[in-house]
Amino acid sequence: MEETMVHLTVDIGGRPGVDCLGFCAYCYFKHAKDVPPFGCRYCLPFMKGCDYCSRGVKEEYSGFLPLQSVAESFLADLQMVTGEVTRITISGGGDPSCYHEFRDLIEMLGTLDIPLHIGYTSGKGFDDPEIADFLIANHLTEVSFTVFAADAELRRVWMHDPTPEASLEIICRLAKEIEVYAAIVVLPGVNDDRVLTDTLAWLSDIGVKGVILMRFANHPEQGLILENTPILPGQRVHTVEEFSNLIRDTAAAFPNLRISGTPLYDPRFDSPFAIRKIPELLDRLPIVNKKATIITGAVASPYIRTVISARSGDPSSVVAVDKEIACLITIDDLKSLHLPDLCETVILPGRAFVHDAEAEKVLSRDG
């Protein structure tokens, strides 16, 4: 029998905007209000609010966790493992580069000779390029690093990075030895066009494996649900079509980089919903023979309609709310629906922030 491979996560805690040397100018947690729990499918039937739809969505911690607590929690998880631990991922609400006991944590984990992965860092807490050599020596094999731009001054202004030159040098050193994946929030007129081209060229030259381009969000319909809009007053945002085209064009221009985007698109697999263009896989889906309304976000709706139509379903049964991302739908989105257009049976996105009992009440208010 093959031994099970196990990935463990080390949660260091931390607060967005606090334990990261301050908010980046474009951070979607900036100005976030202490909103009440949204409710979701994981809540108890009689009570709205659980860890997922309250603390989880806000990445709410009291601060970085002490190293002793982190170590004790990790050791407890390690003792429960029956298979081989093949990767340890460091994550949290704050930025690992700003963790006050970061070196001690890395040294502790490094003694295990298990590949380390930093799930995300802006690098703002690193001020000496030597940290790259230290990380490599302690078995770091993969890191996701927010770049924004290869221009140090743009990093300084928009990410509030006090030592942007050091951060860029660290990315460069790491990319020569391990798998580095870059994340870039794209602001039209700031770091797109020539700036983006120069940044991607630099990332390709130094050996970065992949880049995820992230569309900036500035309005509630784009997924800002913490009553914190606008993030940047007056800042333009790419339309979904513009952003999809941007991903397609940059991926074609930089074939050595694995480029994808969020909330869409992945040129390599033509996703999301790549199945829509693979007839042999579509044929495995059952024929639609009953009526129901599928509520989803504006981004997913045309793709779902294509799949439903391919299996003899009615594309009009797919109803899009104004919210673009389906898993960020809230009860307010359901309140805006025209109830006569809905079937008796309604299917909601599984990760939507909607309590089942509240959804039933809102969707049946016309009797």
Where are these regions (language model features)?
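Flexible, acidic/Gly-rich N-terminal and inter-domain linker regions that tether
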Residues: 1-53, 345-356, 360-367
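Core AdoMet radical
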Residues: 9, 31-105, 109-127, 131, ...
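Short acidic, S/G/P-rich loop/turn micro-motifs used as interaction or catalytic elements
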Residues: 94-98, 124-125, 150-153, 188-191, ...
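Active-site beta-loop-alpha junctions enriched in small/polar residues
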Residues: 15, 93-95, 121-125, 148-150, ...
